[in-house]
Regions:
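Asparagine-centered strand-capping/turn motif at beta-strand->loop junctions
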Residues: 26-34, 42
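Sec/Tat signal peptide C-region and signal peptidase I cleavage site
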Residues: 16-20
């Protein structure tokens, strides 16, 4: 009986991990503006990746919209965000976990310029 319970518990843990890996990682835009460029780089670097907004059918991410993120593993990242007004800001040290949703709020934005 004890072995059966351990086996069931192990299967549940494995299934939960597999389902998280099957879900897309997504960015939730909680800034005040529509985002037209969203790039990620490993925290503390300027090795910016592709514009993730290309993953959206209209190429932008409205307030309270979620964007599918591709080509990014779990870890800490900096984000470069350009909104429709032309403002470019950064969000630093974002914790991203594969298969989960992460958000950036207006208060997270620093070093903004036009």
């Amino acid at each position: 009986m004890h072995r059966t319970l351990l086996l069931v518990a192990a299967l549940l843990v494995t299934a939960a991990g597999a389902s998280a890996a099957d879900r897309p990682t997504r960015f939730w835009n909680l800034t005040h503006n529509t985002v037209q460029e969203f790039q990620l780089a490993p925290a503390g670097t300027a090795a910016w990746g592709e514009n993730q907004c290309k993953n959206d059918k209209d190429g932008t991410v409205d307030f309270d919209e979620r964007l599918r993120i591709t080509g990014v593993e779990s870890g800490r990242y900096d984000a470069r965000i350009k909104d429709m007004s032309g403002r470019v800001c950064f969000a630093r040290n974002i914790n991203i976990r594969a298969g989960e949703v992460f958000s950036v709020e207006e208060r997270d934005l620093v070093d903004c310029s036009r």
